[in-house]
């Protein structure tokens, strides 16, 4: 069976695969445009995106907006297919500025999690009014429960007469910061299969009343074409994958960052407590060992990039640690990774990865349903 397309209203991706936004700097225009050109949805991560701007220290908010503009334009220049998204965490201090920048640049989709993006439609309306034209950008929250999806549908409808254009449902096997309590991470009640089904049921009445589709995307631990088939059979419209795209030639991170995935063993995948107070999934290394022994201390904070960060008490600056890792300086940083990161055994091109996933999908689909 051929993989179905993924539709967000009038926008269509040929392949129902979203490359998850990965910061700091791991998914920029290089990776995002390569994924889009294979028919998927490429996503630029916005956290600390202005890191290379020479004026970042003086103007961190402006730097992030300027570089985001540059990255979106570079991606668009290199794209011949697919859709382009940006991932903007609600927890970012400059959330509004990044959102309005992305909309003004006519990005296809804004994915937003790390909190509930309750006012996202307001920014769409503001930019549309400023430009005096209707903008094409779709708004897709990232949630971890049917309850959160229901709240957003209800709030957006009552306040803005707007329904989400889709939902990404992120489960406890994802990499990076996790929207779960530590004790929920291995609880079957919070498995991705359970919460995807929960969100599908939560959005169903809203979709029926509006007489349109609200696609639900499965994310967090999705690794093979077989996984894709499983979630499509459940009623998901597509999947989001992050870890698989790190080990590609087009990934924007340093080669040392990618090799950390290739070299990882099952026991290297661990849960850490982030300085911002959330659990996170990462790969063990000497930096994290030093943190656990209390040997790390933050440098002066250039910009409080995350609202929840207490820079006075934080054992280290997570933004700087992730930036160091992106540059390949893993002695002074670490790598966020999904639960299946240890399965990565080589670096391939994005095209090779897509071809592999399509073959796996076909094999699994026909094995399960030989008709």
Language-model features, listed with the residues they occupy:
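Active-site entrance/lid segments in N-terminal catalytic domains of soluble metabolic enzymes
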Residues: 1-209
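Conserved active-site-proximal phosphate/metal-binding subdomains
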Residues: 18, 174-217, 223-371
């Amino acid at each position: 069976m051929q993989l179905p397309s993924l539709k967000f209203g009038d926008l269509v991706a040929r392949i129902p695969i979203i490359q998850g936004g990965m910061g700091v700097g791991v998914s920029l225009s290089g990776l995002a445009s390569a994924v889009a050109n294979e028919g998927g949805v490429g996503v630029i991560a916005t956290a600390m995106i202005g890191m290379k701007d020479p004026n970042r220290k003086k103007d961190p908010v402006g730097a992030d907006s300027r570089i985001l503009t540059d990255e979106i334009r570079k991606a668009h220049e290199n794209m011949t297919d697919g859709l382009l998204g940006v991932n903007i965490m609600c927890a970012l201090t400059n959330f509004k500025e990044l959102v309005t920048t992305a909309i003004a640049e006519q990005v296809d989709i804004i994915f937003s999690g790390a909190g509930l993006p309750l006012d996202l439609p307001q920014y769409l309306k503001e930019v549309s009014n400023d430009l005096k034209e209707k903008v094409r950008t779709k708004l897709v929250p990232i949630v971890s429960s049917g309850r959160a999806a229901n709240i957003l549908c209800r709030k957006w409808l009552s306040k803005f007469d707007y329904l989400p254009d889709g939902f990404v449902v992120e489960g406890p096997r994802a990499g990076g910061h996790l929207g779960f309590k530590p004790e929920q991470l291995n609880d079957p009640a919070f498995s991705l299969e359970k919460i995807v089904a929960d969100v599908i049921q939560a959005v169903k009445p809203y979709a029926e009343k509006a007489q349109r589709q609200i696609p639900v995307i499965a994310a967090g631990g999705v690794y093979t074409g077989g996984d894709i088939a499983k979630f499509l059979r459940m009623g998901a419209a597509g999947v989001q994958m992050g870890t698989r795209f790190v080990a590609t030639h087009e990934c924007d991170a340093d080669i040392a960052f990618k090799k950390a995935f290739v070299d990882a063993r099952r026991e290297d995948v661990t849960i850490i407590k982030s300085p911002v107070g959330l659990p996170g999934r990462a790969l063990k290394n000497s930096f994290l060992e030093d943190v656990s022994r209390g040997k790390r201390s933050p440098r002066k904070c250039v910009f409080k990039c995350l609202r929840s960060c207490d820079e006075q008490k934080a054992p280290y600056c997570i933004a700087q640690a992730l930036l160091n890792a992106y540059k390949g300086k893993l002695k002074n940083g670490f790598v966020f990774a999904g639960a299946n990161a240890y399965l990565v055994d080589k670096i391939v091109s994005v095209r090779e990865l897509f071809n592999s996933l399509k073959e796996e999908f076909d094999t699994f689909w026909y094995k399960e349903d030989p008709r």
